[in-house]
Design a protein with these regions (language model features):
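N-terminal Rossmann-like NAD(P) cofactor-binding module of classical short-chain dehydrogenase/reductase
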Residues: 79
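Phosphate-binding/catalytic loops
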Residues: 86-101
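Residues at the C-termini of beta-strands that transition into short coil/loop
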Residues: 37, 82, 99-101
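Short glycine-rich anion-binding loops that position phosphate/pyrophosphate groups of nucleotides
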Residues: 11-13, 83-86
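Local beta-strand N-terminus motif with an aromatic residue
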Residues: 75-76
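Short, charged/polar "capping" segments at the starts of alpha-helices
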Residues: 41-44, 85-89
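Conserved active-site segments centered on acidic
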Residues: 2-68
């Protein structure tokens, strides 16, 4: 069974989108990656789309999501890719939280 990983950053427009795209592309046989933001923007940063496209990963159809979308899901790991106060945010259930600032 694939391990579920959720990447979270401030806007879900850059770092978390890159992490989700790379993990699914290279290790999609072992992991199922998702991403969300604490304060999502309206669209993914165009440079994020461009950089991933350069290595063969297409995320042009992705839109930033709020972390609450995954409130009722359970993840094997949540990776926090920002420096943000998480006290005011309800995170999904997980076995492990990793902070990468």
């Amino acid at each position: 069974m694939k391990k579920k990983v959720l990447f979270i950053c401030n806007h879900n427009a850059g770092r978390s989108q890159i992490a989700e795209g790379i993990l699914n592309y290279y290790y999609g046989d072992k992991y199922e990656a998702f991403s969300a933001g604490l304060n999502p923007t309206e669209s993914v940063n165009p440079y994020t789309i461009k950089v991933l496209r350069e290595i063969g990963i297409d995320i042009s159809g992705k839109t930033p999501l709020h972390v609450s979308k995954y409130r009722d899901e359970k993840f094997d790991e949540i990776v926090i890719a920002c420096d943000y106060d998480l006290d005011n945010h309800e995170l999904p259930a997980t076995e492990r939280i990793t902070e990468k600032k």
